[in-house]
C-alpha cells in the first residue's frame, strides 16, 4: 500500500515538473523552437528567455498604472523605467531587493525609539505578592529598558 502511494506521489511530482518546465505542445509539434524564445536587444544573459518566463514577467499592468503615476515624485521605479527606455529584469530585481531591505529595517527600528519591549515580551511574572498603592510595581507589567 505504501509503495503505491509513493509511486503515485512520484508520478504526480514528475508530471507537475514536466508541465511547468516544458513549452506548449504546439511549439513542440511544430519543431520551430525559435518561436518559443523571446529575444531582447542586447548581449546579456537575459537576451533570450523562454516564453514561460515572460508570461510570469508581465509588465503591462504596471506600465498602465505607471502612466498616471509618472507625474508623482514618489515613483522611483517608473522614473528608472523611463530613463532606461523600458524595464530590464536586473533593474527590477535590484529595486525589489532594496524595497525588501527597507521593509525589514522598518520592522527592526519600530520598538527602538519607544523604550518598551513589545507586548509579547512583557514580564508578567513579576507581580508583587502584596499590592500596595505606594509601590510602583503594583499595577504595571511592562518591563522598561535601562
UniProtKB/Swiss-Prot annotation:
Q: Which UniProt keywords apply?
A: Cleavage on pair of basic residues, Neuropeptide, Secreted, Signal
Report the domain of life of the source organism: Eukaryota
As recorded, the propeptide runs across 25-80, 92-146
Which residues belong to the signal peptide in this entry?
A: 1-24
**Transmembrane residue ranges:** none
Gene Ontology terms: biological process: neuropeptide signaling pathway
Location(s), subcellular: Secreted
**Where does tissue-level expression of this protein occur?**
Neuron L5.
Tell me the function of this protein.
May have important functions in renal physiology and in animal behavior, as does bradykinin.
Q: What is this protein called?
A: Bradykinin-like neuropeptide
Q: The organism's lineage?
A: Eukaryota, Metazoa, Spiralia, Lophotrochozoa, Mollusca
Amino acid at each position: 500500500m505504501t509503495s503505491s502511494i509513493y509511486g503515485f506521489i512520484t508520478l504526480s511530482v514528475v508530471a507537475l515538473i514536466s508541465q511547468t518546465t516544458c513549452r506548449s505542445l504546439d511549439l513542440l509539434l511544430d519543431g520551430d523552437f525559435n518561436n518559443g524564445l523571446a529575444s531582447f536587444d542586447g548581449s546579456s544573459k537575459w537576451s533570450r528567455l523562454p516564453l514561460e518566463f515572460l508570461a510570469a514577467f508581465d509588465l503591462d499592468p504596471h506600465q498602465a498604472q505607471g502612466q498616471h503615476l509618472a507625474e508623482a515624485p514618489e515613483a522611483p521605479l517608473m522614473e528608472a523605467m523611463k530613463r532606461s527606455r523600458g524595464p530590464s529584469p536586473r533593474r527590477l530585481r535590484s529595486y525589489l531587493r532594496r524595497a525588501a531591505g527597507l521593509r525589514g529595517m522598518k520592522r527592526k527600528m519600530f520598538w527602538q525609539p519607544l523604550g518598551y519591549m513589545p507586548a509579547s515580551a512583557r514580564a508578567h511574572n513579576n507581580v508583587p505578592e502584596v499590592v500596595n498603592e505606594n509601590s510602583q510595581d503594583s499595577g504595571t507589567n511592562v518591563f522598561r529598558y535601562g
